[in-house]
Each structure stands twice: as C-alpha cells, then as structure tokens.
Curated annotation (Swiss-Prot):
Residues 775-785 have a biased composition (Acidic residues). GO terms for molecular function: amino acid transmembrane transporter activity. The chain crosses the membrane at residues 58-78, 83-103, 119-141, 187-207, 216-236, 251-271, 291-311, 337-357, 360-380, 384-404, 407-427, 568-588, 596-616, 628-648, 655-675. Residues 715-785 are annotated as: Disordered. Residues 727-740 have a biased composition (Low complexity). This is Probable cationic amino acid transporter.
Amino acid sequence: MSGLFAKLDPRRVQWGANWFAFRSRVLRTKPVESMLETSGGTGAHGTKLARVLSTVDLVSLGVGSCVGTGMYVVSGLVAKEMAGPGVIVSFIIAAVASILSGVCYAEFGVRVPKTTGSAYTYSYVTVGEFVAFFIGWNLILEYLIGTAAGASALSSMFDSLANHSISGFMINHIGTLNGLGKGEQSYPDILALVIGILVTVIVALGVKNSVGFNNVLNVINLVVWVFIMIAGLFFVSGSNWDEGRFLPYGWSGVMQGAATCFYAFIGFDIIATTGEEAKSPNTSIPYAITASLVTCLTAYVSVSVILTLMVPYTEIDSDAPLMEMFSLHGFQTAKYIVAIGSIAGLTVSLLGSLFPMPRVIYAMAGDGLLFRFLAHVSTYTETPAVACVVSGFLSALLALLVSLRDLIEMMSIGTLLAYTLVSVCVLLLRYQPEGDIHGFVNFLSEQNSKRKEGVLAECEKEACSPVSEGDDYGGVPTNTCGAKNLPSLGDNEMLIGKPDKSTYTASHPNYGTVDMSSGIESDETDSAYLLKLKKLLGPRYYTMRIRLGLPGKMDRPTVATGRIVTRCVVLLFILIFCFCSLIIFGSGQIADGQWWAVLLLVVLLLVLTLLVFIIIQQPENPKRLPYMAPCVPFVPASAMLVNVYLMLKLSTITWIRFGVWCFVGVLIYFGYGMWNSTLEITAREEEAHASTYQRYDMGVDDNFAVDDDLYPSGDQGPFQNWGKGGQQKQPQQEQSEPQSDGLDRLDNHRTSSSSSHSRAKSKASKPSPGFEALVVDDDLDDPLE
C-alpha cells in the first residue's frame, strides 16, 4: 500500500528519502575501528599523542582540578550563607551525588579507554553524532568558563594580598565595564588576561611538562592542607557547634548547600579526556576517578570541620575564608602560608579546566565536526597546540572582559548535562543485545530498512552478509559491515590496549569486554552486593526472582528487549525532568497539601518506579568489563535524578545564556559539521564507489537475462558466446533434468556469482575498466552445471 501511495505522489518519495538521510546523519555512530592505532605510526588525526600519564598523574589531575576552588572558596561560602557547620553534611551529600556519576564515567572509561574527548567520544560511539556534538560543544563551554573563572579567581587572590590596590588602579586609570559585568567594580582584568596566557603556554609546551607543574602545585597544596589541620587544632572551640548552631538553616539549607558543594567536585571528568595519553587507561581511569573523589571529599570535610570550629559561621569571610580565619585569632603568619596554598590550589584548578579543553576540541575537529585545522598536533610537543592556543586565548579574553561573578553562573550546566548523558549511555548499553551494543539507535532499524531501495541497499545488504574469512579467522562467520554498524574483530585489542589477562576477548564485536567462554561464569562474575544479598535471603532469593519476573542466568537480551529498555530510559528521563520540576517549583503547593500537587507527585513516583522495574525485568548483556558500575539500573537512574535536579536549580539567566550557546552550536553543526564529518566523507566515497558499478550496467543491454519467453526448451540460449578469450562454451543440460530445475540452478548460480563479484569489487583498489572487461575476464564454469 505504501508503495502505491509513493507511486501516486512522487513528493512523498522525496520527503521520505530526505527524512531518512537526515535521521541517518544525526544518529550515525563512530565506528571504533576508526580509532585503531598503528604501532609506530600516526594516529587518526596525524601525530599521535604521547602516552606519558601514569595513574598517579591522573589522580593528581583529578584532585587538582577539583580541590582548589572547593577548599579555598566553596567551603566558606556555603558555611556562611547556606548551611553553617552543616556544610560538612552538604559536602558528604554532594560527594555521594558525584560518585554516582563518577562510577558511570569509570565504566565508560574502561569501555572506550583509548580516546580523547571524554563524554563526547563516549556519546559518539554509542548514542549518535548530533548528541555527541551537543555534549562536546557544552563541554567546551564548561572548560572555557572554568579557565576564565580560574584566572579571575587568581587575580582576585593577588588583589586581596595587595589590599585591593590592583583593582583600584584599574578602575581609576582604565575604567569599568558596566555592560559586561555586575556593578561598578567590574573592570578590565588585565592581570587575569596575563595569567590565562601564561597557563596556556605551560599547557601547550607538552603534557609531561604541564603534568609535572601540576604535581608540584599539588604537593604545595598538600603541605598547606596539613598545616591548616595542625595549626587549626590550637584554635578550635566546641561552642561553635552548640545546640542550634550546627544546623542553623535547617535541612533545607543543607540541601541547598549540597547543590552548591556539588560544583566543588566538578572536574574529575578531566581524567576521562586523557585516555589517549594514559599508559594503562583500562585500569588507571576507574581507579583515578574514584581516588580523586575520595581525596577531595577528605579535604573538604576536614577543612570544613576546622573552619567551623575555629570561627562562628556568622563571622566567616566568604571571599577568603581560610586566610582570614587565622587573622581573626591574630596568627598573621599563617595567613600568608595559607595564601601560598590558595594560589597553588587555584592554579591547579585553572590547569584542570584548561588541560581537557583543547583535547575535546582536538577530538571534535579530528572527526570533522569542528574546523579541521584545530586537530593539528605539534610534532615537537605532541599536544594539540592549535586547539590549545585558540581555546586559551578565548578564555583569557573572557577573563579580561567578564567578571568572576558572571562567569561562575554559567560554569556547571554543561557538565551536568554531560554527566546525565553518560549515565543514560551506561544504562542503555547494559541491556542491548550483542549485535547492537555498538549502536543502540538500531531500534529504528525496522522502519529504516523499509526505506532503503536501489543499489546502495543491495550493496549494504551484501556487505553485511555473514561470510567466511578463510585462513584469517579459521572459517568463522563474521559480519563485514563493521564500518557502519558493528566494530570489527580487532576492536577489543585496540580499545583496551594490550590485554592484561587472557580473559579479554579478541574475537568478539563487544569491545572492551571479558570473554565469558574463558572460564568466567555468571555466578563468578556476580558483584559483591549480589553475593551478600544471596547469602542474606538464601533460597528465598531465587523464589523472589521468579515471582518478580526477573531474567534468569541464561537469558540474553534481544532486539525487542533492547528496544523496550531504550523507550523506558527515554520516558524515565522525561519523567525525572517533570518530577524535579515539581519538587523545585511546586514545593510550596506540596507542603500546603494541595490535592493536585500531591496526586501528581504520587503518580510520578509510581510511574518512575514502574519504569525502573520494567528495566530490571529485561536481561543484561552477559559480557563483563574489567570495571562495571554497580547496582545498575539504580546507580545510573539516581545519577540522572541528581543531575537533572541540580540543573533545574540554576538561575533563569544561566538557562538563557546556555540556550544562546547551544543555538550557535546547532548552526555550526548543521552548517559545517554534518557535511564535513569524517563519517559523511566516508559515506560519500562508498556511494561514489557503488555508483561506479551501477553506471557500468546502465548502458549495457543485458543479454544474459533468463526469461521463459526468450529461452524456450531446446534452444541454445543467449549464452553460446559467453567464454574466456573468445572461446565459446555451449551450455549443457542433462536430458533427464527438467528445464525448471535448470533455470533454478542458473538463478542460484548467478546470485552466488553476483555476491562473489561484489566482494571482489569492494576490495579492489581501482574501479573496473568496464562491464565488457568483466565478461571477457570471467572464468566461470558452465552456469547450468
């Protein structure tokens, strides 16, 4: 019926083709074989990045990117204005929320370790091109603003040590920038510009140099932290935590403080951007993420305890809390010692923002989504020097013209969105079948397959047919369409480096996994949490699983179950957004007991619970990674809930600015990135290659078609002149064989020959000179034999 309508309305054919092409472009995923390394050669974008980062270096980068602003700025701000001494609880809650996203990041870091670009690359190989560009574009925003804010914070620190003489000089001799900042004290911060340029030069000189500089500053910061702990013990007073003073703003203040403290943990995603420069990314990345978050939590809680015990929360200086707390007790020397640590910590935070930014730009430009000159890697420093210089200059320019207060308001929304997407991807990939784990967007395949017509569809159908590779793979059937849908057999070796254990599969399309046939059974791979639950419940555990309809050990995901999970996750995200909006903007109505608000809250909770339960009932993919996020789907769903809640807590002006930035990114993608993407260029080359053989057929009268009307019984048929070198070969038939059987054998033989020719053409380095040459060179046996 649809074919009839298509014939009656040609516009429908054109619209359908255009819509299919558009949807294919925005949903196409990056094949993992494109990231294959060549030993001793160059990478995908030219010169390879140097592998010089150890696990200690990664932990140092993660800690440094977080601990500076969190310890020296956020602790005092939250303690004074939001939670009082309850800032300790706020930091713990924020740490739990950060760990939820951190474990999801760690699993993705193991699944796709040898990449740059963090959530951008993770999204590209799993979700699709447009979503990946959107996430990468907003990661650039986060790092851009974070770098500018770090430079401005350092400038303010130096200005404070100089008794504000620097800002006074700028205002008196240069003037203010009322149009770009808030208040009369917004001035062109030349010192911040200089700081931004200097740090850009340090990062551009090379990874090893910048990481070494980062480690030195972290050591200084560690020494100052130890000094604060020891010196502060001599001035603590338990009266500051007397009854009523620990939670002066109540639990609402603690939760508000937790939302702010969460920003102190933003930055561990820098570890995920260094996969192409880490020595052992499959083990270093998850360990470094976890160790960084735990280290930051320890530093924040300990500093908050000393701060709130030394100074009543009402007397805390929100701009420089740790420096001024010793001044209140007359210990001026300690103030300058803490100032040294503040400068070191803020500098490391500045490096933590600037270090990953050029690597995200490098990854996007190398894929063609941004201008390709940004993907140039310096042969001297082995760093993306062009991207580093361009991004560093833009950050320094922002620090010069925009005030610190305005920069902070835009700092976190892009990061929270990236964290949310990573959690979504982890949840989706766990429940996809083995064939679709590389691209779960194949739930649209049923509709898409009906749209494909013509030579390209036949080529794709034939290219994706299972074939035997002979001696190379021992005759094992393999899928040959890896460049479009599935990773190749060697992807696992590429993505996880040299296997540390023999359990890594080297012949399975699920890259980054452990081969279950190597002796690791399902019971042995159960998590510690599941084993404890089994011991606790005993035989009732299996009875409960049966009654709840949970999948068995031998159940495997299918396309249908994967599609169910995909739809449930989409609905889960939408309903989480509605639920958080109701909690934030309808809290007053809920507290007043208005029936519609309470009813809506209950309905949302029930539907969210139902969706999670439906996901639990679907079988998981049995393949194991060296590290996997625990308690799926609860951990990713909880991370989504927390991140969406914090995003909605941001101000309206932040959302407006975020919308403008996204609009510019959409223009760049649809105007440049979509048409210059590496995947787009590859698709064009494949289409041109296929159309070459189509043109050979168009101008040739097909004398070889077999038709009952043209090939009556007893005739020699049109094959009498088909032979090699002009030799004639007469088609022979056995007299006892019916004519219909001969025709069936002929059709089968022609189909097999066509498949052989197509595979031969796809491997040829040059196109065939013509259809006639193919006929002359053909050495086929008699088609009816």
